[in-house]
Amino acid sequence: MCAERLGQFMTLALVLATFDPARGTDATNPPEGPQDRSPQQKGRLSLQNTAEIQHCLVNAGDVGCGVFECFENNSSEIRGLHGICMTFLHNAGKFDAQGKSFIKDALKCKAHALRHRFGCISRKCPAIREMVFQLQRECYLKHDLCAAAQENTRVIVEMIHFKDLLLHEPYVDLVNLLLTCGEEVKEAITHSVQVQCEQNWGSLCSILSFCTSAIQRPPTAPPERQPQVDRTKLSRAHHGEAGHHLPEPSSRETGRGAKGERGSKSHPNAHARGRVGGLGAQGPSGSSEWEDEQSEYSDIRR
């Protein structure tokens, strides 16, 4: 449940980070088509920014974080790559040999991909963002981010700061990948981010935790209902038993039945009427049937 809770925080961070996506974008360039400018995808990298980034990429060295710094000040607000690079380099000494190898290879992979792909895509900000995040995922997975995280969990957790998740989308992408690296890594990151959230947001973070737990709590299973067929069978069986256990006739009904049997030798319907009278309720109708039976019996004797 903690992992899902962290997922909610990541979503909130993305929402906060995209409040003003069009700030600083080139407004002089018209859209290529009517469908190209959706409400949250109006941004386009200005020609000046494009030229500056391309020039920066050419002059940036292969070692260090120079390539990522080229994307820090741009009109598409693609930020965070340089911060991730610097964080990895500053903490490289805390990693084991496998972790150091991952940092070196992953950063080199990302820098190489940025150089080769930037000039081949559209100037639309969403396209540039997608390119950046896609190549970042590819490099992390290619050089086995999870293996490095599992062997250096404590260092990885120390590198993740709550404020960066609110400001930089590349951090969110990195954390989402780390959450898939096994239970130990996931639990450690979740606990760290939750503690930092409470330190920064206080009771608001607790409210979010309560809401997410309430939303994701499995519904209480209703009591098992007996199938309709079974209930029908039981109902029929109940009525059948009630039919077999009829009330015992009273002494008056017994005498009337005996007289009915004697009269049935000449009048076959008399016995049937006697039985119906025995099953019926006591009342005015019962006395009238008794009088009819007496008159019929008198006629038979005559």
From Swiss-Prot:
Phosphothreonine modifications at: T254
Gene: STC2
UniProt key word Lipid biosynthesis: no
Record note on quaternary structure: Homodimer; disulfide-linked.
UniProt function note: Has an anti-hypocalcemic action on calcium and phosphate homeostasis.
Segments of this protein annotated with the region Disordered: 23-44, 217-302
PANTHER family: STANNIOCALCIN, STANNIOCALCIN-2
Annotated source species: Pongo abelii
Any one GO biological process: intracellular calcium ion homeostasis
Phosphoserine PTM positions: S250, S251
Protein name: Stanniocalcin-2
A single GO molecular function term of this UniProt record: hormone activity
Family from the record: Belongs to the stanniocalcin family.
Signal peptide: 1-24
